[in-house]
Design a protein with these regions (language model features):
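Internal, conserved structured core segments that host functional sites
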Residues: 110-169
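Short, polar/flexible loop-turn hinges at active-site or ligand-entry regions and domain interfaces
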Residues: 53-54, 144-148, 236
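Conserved nucleotide- and phosphate/pyrophosphate-binding catalytic cores
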Residues: 21, 159-338
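Short, histidine-centered active-site or binding-site loop motifs used for metal coordination
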Residues: 11-13, 44-46, 143-144, 205, ...
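Short helix-capping/linker segments at secondary-structure and domain boundaries
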Residues: 102-106, 139-146, 255-264
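N-terminal Rossmann-like or analogous alpha/beta NTP/dinucleotide-binding catalytic cores
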Residues: 2-8, 13-135, 283, 296
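A generic secondary-structure signal for well-formed alpha-helical elements
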Residues: 65, 72, 100-103, 142, ...
Length: 338
């Protein structure tokens, strides 16, 4: 591991993971895990920035970790851990809060979008979400962070805080915090809603028909694809801006089948929606079956799951505490003699 560069990423346990989480994030981690020292977090502190059910949070956290492994993450070479189990996340977040100008935060696009959705229920936590994300990344001296286009601004904020507000102010020679670089995930990075091709597939969408969950049984997948928004045109296209639903479903089919987009377009040039929906349904059911089988084995083996998380937490906590100690020392905090 010593010679490998390190990556850090994570998903919120805010409900069932869907194919957007899988194809846009987890599937890419599976590809990267052999090349990088990989730390993967279940970001449960982020999950409480919006309305949530306390009775479901712990269950969803375990389920998310199990799905990481079921989707192909290898706990023998990756550290899988739970954010709230490592107090350094919250502590570094507070330190970064005190170093970050508020006008930097006011520029965050996602807060503006999400605050409209939440109305009067917007919390300080939602506003502060990007600072906690910065703490998540910077704690682990990540060399790279896999991000989609919608998360680029948050990573840029983490980089700016580390360089301009910590390194430049408190260290004249060696950097206190490592400046992470993005790995922009193009393949499947933005899987869209089944009922509105202009919106990203989301766990928070109240309409269950907008997404395919990783644990959906075949009959539910069939029903959701059958009801997915389509149009009156013949042929399934990718580059027609007036047909976002066509582009979205073709992208999903392309990734799952392992075929190039151009090959899929040629294959379905004169195919009607009914035929295409039948084919993509079959592909989804076939692709999700091994994930669902492995998930059921894991979720029914709490000893194995706890072992995976305990080992991951131990590695993550050791690394996080080293970084936090370094930051606090450079920023002038009192250190108790032992």
């Amino acid at each position: 591991m010593a010679n490998k560069k390190r990556i850090l990423s994570g998903v919120q346990p805010t409900g069932d993971l869907h194919i957007g989480n899988w194809l846009g994030a987890i599937n890419n981690w599976v590809t990267l895990q052999e090349q990088y020292e990989t730390f993967l977090c279940v970001v449960d502190l982020h999950a409480i920035t919006a309305s949530y059910n306390p009775k479901e949070l712990s269950k969803n956290t375990i389920s998310t970790a199990a799905l990481y492994v079921a989707c192909g993450i290898d706990p023998n070479i990756c550290s899988i851990f739970v954010q709230s189990q490592i107090s350094a996340h919250s502590e570094l977040c507070w330190i970064l809060n005190c170093m970050t100008p508020i006008n930097w935060m006011e520029r965050m696009i996602q807060f503006k979008e999400k605050s409209i959705q939440q109305g009067n229920n917007v919390s300080i936590g939602l506003f502060d979400y990007p600072i906690l994300m910065a703490a998540d990344i910077l704690l682990y001296d990540a060399d790279f962070v896999p991000v989609g286009e919608d998360q680029k601004q948050h990573l840029e904020l983490a980089r700016d805080i580390a360089q301009q507000r910590i390194n430049a102010r408190f260290s004249k020679d060696k950097n206190i915090l490592k400046i992470p670089q993005p790995i922009i995930m193009k393949n499947g990075s933005k899987i869209m809603s089944l009922i509105d091709g202009s919106k990203k597939m989301s766990k928070s969408d109240p309409n269950e028909g907008s997404r395919i969950n990783l644990l959906d049984p075949p009959e539910i997948i069939t029903k959701k694809i059958k009801r997915a928004k389509s149009d009156s045109s013949i042929g399934i296209e990718f580059n027609n801006p007036e047909r976002p639903e066509s582009k979205n479903l073709l992208m999903i089919y392309s990734i799952l089948s392992g075929k190039e987009i151009s090959q899929c377009e040629n294959e379905f040039l004169e195919t009607g929606w009914g035929t295409f929906k039948k084919l993509i349904t079959e592909q989804l059911i076939e692709s999700l079956e091994p994930i669902q089988k492995k998930y059921k084995l894991l979720i029914n083996d709490p000893y194995q799951l706890n072992k995976i998380l305990n080992e991951g937490n131990e590695k993550a906590e050791d690394l996080a505490n080293q970084t936090l100690k370094r930051v606090k020392s450079k920023l002038g905090f009192f250190e108790m003699e032992k």
